[in-house]
């Protein structure tokens, strides 16, 4: 899927070097096609790295996608140039009157922070509530999944004593589920979180359909029956070295982190990790875009009332 982004976005050259089809705004403007409008609320500290990861996964299908990057934290960033944010990101006030086909809310390193202590918690609540009327389907990733469950289903924060970190085997729950169509019966995905998502906890407190689980990591994929909200509790977007970078960062900070499970060859942190989750990540995003966004979103976004046949 050609992703439509500003001509000067750093991800353009990065992804083109990987042979990923990126369509700049200038080229897309000459095509008479209604692109899917996807809003990416980027909560990760390293904005540019996260942009690359998600744009890579959004690029692998034949439809055109118009990506809008959204920020809500007005504090001076430590890991991303202010000029980059000012050039490529919008504030919520600039888009709140618009409708979108899809919204992706990324993870955030806030696993041990209470919701009410998050600096932009009120803004998160406003956007997730806004999305119910303005977005066809919303995809929550990792910490955002926990935040979404709290805001939409009033579920309390479920924090584990020990961080889940590593690459875990998962099993699909329904061979005919659209979100996992084409998945192998077992597949791998990275996790890096303190949040717990026990299967029974989700089943007993929501009407969400659980679509994939892990014995070690709990519920991984679950979604509403009307396809309006989707939760992925891991990080299918992670690069090969993201977990390694997090581990070595925490070692340098003196936090004595546990070694990510099922990740480093021979459990040796000096060896290069092998990727076992890339194909599943691409397929997950392709299925979400096709079955949860494209097939139910209205052609005219002014008529926002997506329903299922």
Swiss-Prot record:
Coiled coil: none annotated. Its EC number is 2.3.1.46. This is Homoserine O-succinyltransferase. It is an enzyme of class 2 (transferase). GO terms for molecular function: homoserine O-acetyltransferase activity; homoserine O-succinyltransferase activity. It catalyses: L-homoserine + succinyl-CoA = O-succinyl-L-homoserine + CoA. NCBIfam families: metA. The lineage of its organism: Bacteria, Pseudomonadati, Pseudomonadota, Gammaproteobacteria, Enterobacterales. Pathway: Amino-acid biosynthesis; L-methionine biosynthesis via de novo pathway; O-succinyl-L-homoserine from L-homoserine: step 1/1. Pfam families: HTS (PF04204). Keywords: Acyltransferase, Amino-acid biosynthesis, Cytoplasm, Methionine biosynthesis, Transferase. Gene3D superfamilies: 3.40.50.880. It comes from Proteus mirabilis (strain HI4320). The record marks 111 as: Important for acyl-CoA specificity.
